[in-house]
């Protein structure tokens, strides 16, 4: 990853785009597919890089920024449930200084002179849920989903042992939130059953819990050893108690399971002592935890702190360091991705780390192999932070055998045997054979049908591989003629292994449904290198319609200077990305494929809708000392209402809020005839927005 302090604005723009796409994909895999692609530590590193870039270049923050979102868009097979209060994720603290900063932010934000009591509890590595009771009867159970809309899993939650279906002496409307999990020993037993039945084993306890909850048949869920803890009252918690410790006492009285391992800390020292206690004893707990959650105990103070886009300000998660293990590197295999990028993968002697068996680890790029001096048959150190794919930290050189083998970086593609192209600035090796490379073609079709592209349900990895192997499809266009081909064939798809009449009917129905697609989704589905969802939206906004888009791309092939300049001027499309677009449309087969797709698809023109309020997009400046609220609280409220808070006054400023001892900014605002109000007027204004 590049040094944030030295990065240029253009480089930052490109990196933010890449991070948005990567993190969105990782979120979808984690929250929706229950199949994490990277470790917690690697995800956190990417997310923190994104935050640092946004702090340095706030004007480059994307509409689809990971810092604005929680989780991932929900799938279609469950009914949707809208959370009255969003189920947001927590910010992370990785060391004691991060925790001290968290405590200091609370003091500064709330203008406190003393330490405000902090409630500490284990961070269970499970699946978040919400349960709603009306007149004491359980009516709705839901997953977190994207934080705003989850999936209805009421029938499945009711199968969990000791989960109350009816409770007494509670308000007419009650919500509880918590974590559903599977204990370590139960997980091992479950995987043993899966293996005996010839089924795939679960990667870890969290995946097993998530997969169990997302069963359409609740009788399957009932057979899984699910357990739960509640830790929040959601929209109704402040009707039950005035603090977190009181709330848990009340929920326990109602019959809910709460985690008895908790601590109400009255100092930083008590916080750190509890953290060390849990870190030392985590392996002795029956369930997996990956850190400690700290939250302001007082609900009134929580209300004042409020939220940022995806996190509450009043809480944070102090993560445990990753678990380290050692095993043998058996071999290095190479995967070819959608855009031709080759990625080395370490094949390992299976090792159990934190209750999970690990046999593979990504090596990211070929330079990492050389930098770490990795050799086949070496003993390597693995780092795992609660997920599936660990990271190789280095080699145990003291145990290096005499017969180790160095890995030779390939010169030719392992899929199509074409000569590989090496780009030092990207630290990658790429196959430029495009659709003629079977591996790239497979990944391109997988991308085309994926959730955020054409969204063709029923065409997963195995199904795409099967259809390609049988010669039924060879490019994205073939998908839309699959039914026609099947109808005229003697060898029907529904009679083949892994298929049935119902699954084939559903597939054809979903293919037909996908023919109505928005222009941004269509452009994203094409799989142009570095054109993620955000850049696809930029192009769609610029060209408006499919016909204009394809016409302009054909002009680009003729080196038309106007279209080149138009693209180059787009915010978010730098020189490097422009080269990728040109390279894609320089391939005649790509243009022909897109035209044929355009003939059979209904590609909707681009439309942009935004909710408006009186402060949306207004530029507000705060100056001087505000009598009753902190500057941070005022800024947070303004941003929550859609305003942009600037540090300096200019002709673009819409409003200046002036406190005591306002200086040069107030003077400049008067000179520019900008509207000026005091704190009292500001509080009245935001109350009426």
Swiss-Prot record:
**EC number(s) recorded for this UniProt protein:** 6.5.1.2
Q: This protein's superkingdom? A: Bacteria
Keywords, A to Z? DNA damage, DNA repair, DNA replication, Ligase, Magnesium, Manganese, Metal-binding, NAD, Zinc
What positions does UniProt annotate as the active site of this protein?
Answer: 123
Annotated BRCT domain residues: 610-689
Residues bound to NAD(+): 40-44, 89-90, 121, 144, 179, 295, 319
Cofactor section:
Mg(2+); Mn(2+)
Q: List cellular component terms (GO).
A: cytosol
Chain positions recorded as Zn(2+) binding sites: 413, 416, 431, 437
Recorded catalytic reaction(s): these are:
NAD(+) + (deoxyribonucleotide)n-3'-hydroxyl + 5'-phospho-(deoxyribonucleotide)m = (deoxyribonucleotide)n+m + AMP + beta-nicotinamide D-nucleotide
What biological-process GO terms show up in the record?
DNA repair; DNA replication
Any idea which GO molecular function terms this record carries?
DNA ligase (NAD+) activity; metal ion binding
Q: Which family does it belong to?
A: Belongs to the NAD-dependent DNA ligase family. LigA subfamily.
Function, as annotated, reads: DNA ligase that catalyzes the formation of phosphodiester linkages between 5'-phosphoryl and 3'-hydroxyl groups in double-stranded DNA using NAD as a coenzyme and as the energy source for the reaction. It is essential for DNA replication and repair of damaged DNA.
Protein name, UniProt field: DNA ligase
Species of origin: Rickettsia rickettsii (strain Sheila Smith)
Supply the gene name. Answer: ligA
């Amino acid at each position: 990853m590049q040094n944030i302090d030295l990065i240029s604005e253009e480089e930052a723009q490109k990196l933010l785009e890449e991070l948005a796409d990567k993190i969105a994909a990782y979120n979808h895999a984690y929250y929706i597919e229950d199949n994490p692609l990277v470790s917690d530590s690697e995800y956190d590193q990417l997310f923190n890089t994104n935050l640092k870039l946004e702090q340095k270049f706030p004007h480059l923050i994307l509409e689809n920024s990971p810092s604005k979102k929680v989780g991932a868009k929900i799938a279609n097979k469950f009914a949707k449930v809208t959370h009255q209060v969003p189920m947001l994720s927590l910010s992370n603290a990785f060391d004691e200084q991060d925790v001290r900063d968290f405590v200091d932010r609370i003091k500064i934000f709330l203008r406190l002179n003393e330490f405000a009591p902090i409630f500490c509890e284990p961070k269970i590595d499970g699946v978040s849920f919400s349960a709603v009771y009306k007149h004491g009867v359980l009516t709705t159970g839901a997953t977190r989903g994207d934080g705003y809309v989850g999936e209805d899993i009421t029938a499945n939650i009711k199968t969990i042992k000791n989960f109350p279906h009816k409770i007494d002496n509670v308000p007419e409307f009650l919500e509880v939130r918590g974590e559903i999990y599977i204990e370590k020993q139960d997980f091992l037993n479950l995987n043993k059953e899966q293996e005996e039945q010839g089924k795939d084993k679960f990667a870890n306890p969290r995946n097993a819990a998530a997969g169990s909850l997302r069963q359409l048949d609740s009788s399957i869920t009932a057979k899984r050893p699910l357990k739960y803890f509640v830790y929040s009252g959601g929209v109704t918690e402040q009707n039950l108690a005035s603090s977190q410790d009181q709330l848990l006492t009340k929920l326990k009285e109602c019959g809910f399971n709460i985690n008895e391992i908790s601590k109400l800390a009255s100092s930083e020292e008590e916080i750190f002592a509890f953290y060390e206690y849990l870190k030392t004893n985590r392996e002795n707990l029956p369930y997996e935890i990956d850190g400690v959650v700290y939250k302001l105990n007082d609900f009134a103070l929580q209300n004042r702190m409020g939220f940022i886009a995806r996190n509450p300000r009043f809480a944070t998660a102090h993560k445990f360091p990753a678990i380290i293990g050692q095993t043998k590197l058996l071999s290095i295999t190479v995967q070819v991705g959608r855009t031709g990028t080759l990625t080395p993968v370490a094949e390992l002697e299976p090792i159990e780390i934190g209750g999970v068996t690990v046999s593979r680890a990504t090596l990211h790029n070929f330079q990492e192999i050389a930098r770490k001096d990795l050799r086949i048959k070496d003993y390597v150190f693995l780092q795992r932070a609660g997920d599936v794919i660990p990271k190789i930290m280095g080699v145990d050189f003291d145990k290096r055998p005499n017969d180790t083998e160095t890995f030779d970086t390939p010169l030719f593609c392992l899929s199509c045997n074409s000569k590989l192209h090496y780009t030092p600035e990207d630290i990658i090796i790429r196959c430029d054979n495009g659709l003629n490379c079977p591996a790239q073609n497979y990944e391109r079709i997988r991308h085309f049908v994926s959730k955020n592209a054409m969204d063709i349900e029923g065409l997963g990895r195995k199904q795409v591989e099967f259809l390609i192997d049988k010669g039924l499809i060879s490019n994205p266009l073939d998908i839309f003629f699959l039914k026609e081909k099947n109808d005229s064939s003697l060898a029907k798809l529904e009679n083949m292994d892994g298929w049935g009449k119902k699954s084939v009917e559903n597939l054809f129905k979903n293919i037909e449904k996908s023919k109505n697609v928005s222009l941004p989704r269509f452009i994203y589905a094409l799989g142009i290198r570095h054109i993620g969802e955000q850049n696809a939206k930029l192009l769609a906004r610029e060209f408006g319609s499919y016909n204009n888009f394809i016409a302009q791309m054909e002009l680009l092939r003729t080196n038309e200077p106007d279209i080149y300049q138009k693209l180059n001027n787009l915010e978010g499309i730098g020189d490097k990305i422009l080269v990728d677009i040109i390279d894609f449309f320089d391939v005649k087969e790509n243009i022909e494929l897109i035209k044929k797709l355009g003939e059979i698809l209904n590609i909707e023109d681009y439309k942009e809708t935004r909710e408006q309020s009186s402060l949306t997009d207004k530029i507000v400046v705060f100056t001087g000392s505000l009598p009753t609220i902190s500057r941070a609280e005022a800024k947070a409220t303004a941003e929550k209402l859609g305003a942009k808070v600037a540090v300096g006054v200019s002709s673009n400023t819409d409003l200046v809020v002036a406190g005591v001892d306002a200086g040069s900014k107030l003077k400049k605002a008067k000179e520019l005839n900008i509207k000026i109000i005091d704190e009292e007027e500001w509080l009245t204004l935001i109350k009426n927005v």
